[in-house]
Amino acid sequence: KTRNKILLRVAAAALTLGTYLAYMNLNWNAEFGVISDLWNPAKTYRQYGTTVGFTAVAKYMRLTPPDGYSKDEVTAIADTSEKETKTEDLRKDNADSVTPVNIIAIMNESWFDYRSVGDPQTSESYMPFLDSLTENVIKGHTLTCTKGGGTAKTEYEFLTGNSCKRFPGMVPYVSYFTHSQYSLVTTLKDQGYQAIAMHPNKATNWKRSTAYRFLDFDDFISIDQFSDTAKRYRGMISDQANYEKIVETYENKEPGSPFFLFDVTMQNHSGYTNRYFQADINCNGYDSDEADQYFSLLKLSDEAISYLIRYFQQVDEPTMIIMFGDHWPAIEDDFLLKVIGKELPDAFETWIAGDAYQNLSVEDQEKFYGTPFFIWTNYSMKSESNVWISTNYLSSYALSLTGLELTPYNEYLLDLREKMPALNHLGFLASDGTWYRWNDSDAPEEDLEYERQYECLQYNELIDKKDRDDSFFTISGEKDEE
């Protein structure tokens, strides 16, 4: 009887494991036509029923610990980092920095410059103001973990300093946010800043209304707070109207009080075939309403950037504006063939998964993940251009220019950037300027170990609420009990 019980338990365990593995590897779309809408999970529940919808979405909610993860390992990594990081160098570099009263960060929807991957021949320049902006500005490209969609992954990387490298197909806001999260928001609020989020669309998209509460924003201005008469293109709030709302919000704050606003725009969102939108820019030698509309939207976006910068040039309070794109646009394959002249994979799914483009090196592939970014101030700051960074580093990098206090995690990220200047799910840029895939046989072992340690810290902050090393992620070292 004992033997039979053991065999029964083994069989039950094997069946459970087999069912779990089959579930986790099941393609619900291919097998059953069930599409998991992580942008709006409630839509999946409504469309397929609560049971089927939840089952389809739930597979994305499991994140396993990285290799070697433990509370002691996190403590050891944090302790080593605090001993070895170049904290004193950072403080010396920032000694003469102006501390901005206002920090405005804008993630510009589908903002991409095709000149980084090819030579688009357009009837006129689509980024003339940005090209002319050369004083008190740092410009370059920031590497993201997504293309054509997945906006919330890029904003998560910027706000938290964590990377979506381990879960490029998942969205932390939707899958993993169950408790308070440390971020740029908490770092600035601990230093007296008011923190406002803005997005001219539904607050529930990507579960932002919940995510922003866990990130500790004081207020969230969504589409409901925009006027019905606000300028729209293709039914979406224009960047001009969006930035006017930023100015209005700034003007309503207490003069001199520290102010942080994080904005996610909507104007340039796909698709680009609206028959009521008048395109002003044409692609020479390429007849495409989609490409013409996209580049025309970029030009309108550039004009709105000009408005915002020129406004804050006249403001007395020291102000920093950070802008970056969330991902390249979802635009037709034929145009890409025209721009780069090389074959692309057949399915959009392979792009998102990061599968290798045919005939493209890893360095060329990464260019499709590199969106524009700039950091501008209305006070004197050393200008730089052609900077390569990744979005997980960007907020720490911006903070390092302000003279504000940094968390140990900020300092860790700045130190990691010295070793690995840019990284995403596909690969990384080494300190010697060489690009590697994570599974390349010649990828430096030291860099792979740095990345493993980074994953341990991220897992601790994002998932391990019970054993989270709160002091490493805050300037105050106080534990958040939420």
Model-flagged regions — what are they?
Residues 88-101, 105-108, 113-482:
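Solvent-exposed soluble domains appended to multi-pass membrane proteins
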